[in-house]
Amino acid sequence: MYGDPTAIRRLAAGLREQAGEIRGEADRLVARTDAAGWLGRGGDALRDRARERALDLRRAATLHDDAAEALERHAHEVDRLQRLIEEIEGRAGRLLDVARDRLDDWVSGWLDAFHPPPRGSVRWLEVEVPRW
């Protein structure tokens, strides 16, 4: 198939976990520099720089969360399309079974010429089959 929703969701979970780790690292960076006890302009500069880096880390964590959300949406869409393909395959199969059982020989030749796409193929989305 064109994507494994379970694997995609696993990647999304990994990104969310990394986002949490990055946020934790940002918090630890600020806490360590605040706890250093360095006074004066040098200490102030260190703390300012650490807060800037922590902000950058939090932005990176947010981007990880955004990527994870995009992967979740993609996994949902893959699930939806796989169900749609399965439904179309089933309808086409039922139609072919009914048609072969009930139609004259001349139509059977036409039916024999229909070559369904492979199971799970995205080409099933192009097949038009009436609902039964």
Model-derived features with residue positions:
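N-terminal secretion-targeting helices of virulence/extracellular proteins
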Residues: 1-132
